[in-house]
Amino acid sequence: MNKRTISSLIKCFVLLILLLPTWLAWDVSPAQADYILVTTPFDPAPDGCTVSHCSLREAIILANETPTTLDQIYLPTNTYHIERSGNDDTSVLGDFDITSPIEIYGIEDTPSSVVRIEGNQLDRVFEVTGSNGDLWLERVTITEGNQPLYNGGGVACYHATLTLEDVVIVLNSSPTHYGGGLAADHCTVTISNTNITNNTASDGGGIFANVSTQSLINSIVYYNHASEVGGGIYTSNSDIAFYAVTLGDNDAGTRGGGVFQIGTTSSLFIDHSLVSENHAKAEDGGGLQISEGTNLTIVNSTISANVADTFGGGISTSIPTTINHSTIVNNHADMNANNDGYGGGVLAYIGSGVTISNTILANNTDHSAFHYNDCAEYVGVDVISNGYNLVESVGNCTFNSTGDKKGLDPMLGPLQNNGGWTNTHALLIGSPAIDAGNPSVTRIQFPNSDQRGPARYARVINGQVDIGAFEAWLVTFLPVIFR
């Protein structure tokens, strides 16, 4: 049996244990350390898990003694504090060091109960290291971590593997380094059904990734802050993929309010996602600042209401970029109106080649004298239309391909919950984007649903796809004949 199957079989047994008096001890010896129940929220000097006492720190130390064997640790509803300050790599002091395969599960007594693990501002909460380091976290909140000397205020991963499932990472900080919530260096990271919020760092307020692979699925990265670059995410020479992600309300002191990307081998793939209300306070890329990399791909997604004080309110990209079936609206560039930047919606900058199809570019604002509201090309850079775009204000870009519509109001609803995984701008009745997309796109072709995701939000209705990230469901009223 794999570890997921084993986990399911033992959960019923663990719940029976919890029906016994609170903090009843479970005898766990090093020879039988596959499943460990933590019995105290306190963090004393570790002296081993015994019949009467097992702390989270002691459970982790015990699990690390078998570096190639999977151990599962269960945490009943409570708040677990780091109380032992210091710096080592053995979990005796400071953060909890993971050097072997470990799964940690919070056991919530009620739907409203929370399992919290707090750093107490003494250190980050978890550090996952080494070739055997493999941490699976599920149903826990990581908070109050602080690491002023190194990367990763809440969680750090170095040359290891990390999985977050149904986790909240909130109010952690790395004030002079990278990754307020999470820092990954040479790691494989999977983040699912997780909120990363209100974390702070010098760079990468929510997440920092260096030479890593990260997948974010059905997760939220919002209200994070970087004093320099990458309010939500800072990525360097890493492969990042979003699916059903909301990246919103993050801010950076200079560039990349939502995402800042550098590194010649970096790539970013955004699908069925929302990038909204991020702010680059002094420079470029309100939503996305893509400075280096191999490619940027945006499909079935919305880039809305982001702000850059200079270039590229929604997107500023300097690498090959493909945008398809997306909606880019209500973004702002050169917010100070001092002619220090331009490109309200999309800016194709030095080194890029941007290809756009089946996409709405509208209601963006370039506050400079250039007024390149929806699209801007830097000198010597081309934005290529592959057709079936609706662009209200073309700026200095050219949209003359088959199916392109120019100078039209797309007639969008507000950004709100219209069903599905992320907020969207609905197409209102009478929108010129309805049934105006590429007719060769059929129901069975990719993408097979609009941004909202589930199959009930089909990508093609009435026989022809709509332009943008949202597919309108329109009701046809037949005339009633009275006799």
Where are these regions (language model features)?
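Bacterial N-terminal signal peptides that target proteins for export
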Residues: N2-V14
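Bacterial N-terminal signal peptides
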Residues: C12-A25
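N-terminal, post-signal-peptide segments of secreted/periplasmic proteins
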Residues: W26-N151, C157-H159, T163-E165, N339-D340, ...
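Predominantly extracellular beta-rich ligand-binding scaffolds that present long acidic/polar faces
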Residues: Q72, T161-D166, A184-I196, I207-Y223, ...
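Conserved positions at the start
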Residues: D123-V125, G152, G179, G204, ...
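Leucine-rich, hydrophobic repeat-scaffold detector
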Residues: Q147, V168-V170, S174
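Conserved functional hotspot residues at active sites or interaction interfaces
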Residues: P479
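Short, solvent-exposed mixed-charge patches
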Residues: F482-R483
